[in-house]
Amino acid sequence: KGFINAAGIESPGLSSAPAIAEMVTDIVKELLPLEKNPDFVGTRKGILRPDTLSLEERNKLIKEHPEYGNIICRCEMITEGEIMDAIHRPLGARSLDGVKRRTRAGMGRCQAGFCSPRTMEILEREVPMSMFDITKNGVGSNIVVGYNKEV
């Protein structure tokens, strides 16, 4: 009682997932008193891309938020503001690859050779976390492992 097993259901895959979710929702409604959250936002906003704005809109944005005028990744033209947005959003980026997947910073022709140190500085400041804790892509992929002449 109190456990709903939706794993291992023989189905055609993802196409039946919405129907299974509705079925589980109906079961939970019978077991618990549920009420709709009036503040629930069902969609998330994307990361603001200044390069998609008109010149006037971009200038206004930079005037209000100067970090959007600071280019971090020259190859992909990604700004500090975009990286900060990727870090501070729900389930925000916590690694270089996390920032890369959300913003494209590091996907250009230099493959993060120029922007990775600057992206790491932003992660260190905004998360906040130590340079030693910043990874390329999760546990075991630390980039900084010691100080110069110590390693």
Question: What are the functions of these language-model segments?
Answer:
Residues K100-S116, D133-V151:
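Short Fe-S-cluster ligation motifs
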Residues K1-I71, I78-L91, L96, R104-M107:
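C-terminal catalytic lobe of FAD-dependent flavoproteins
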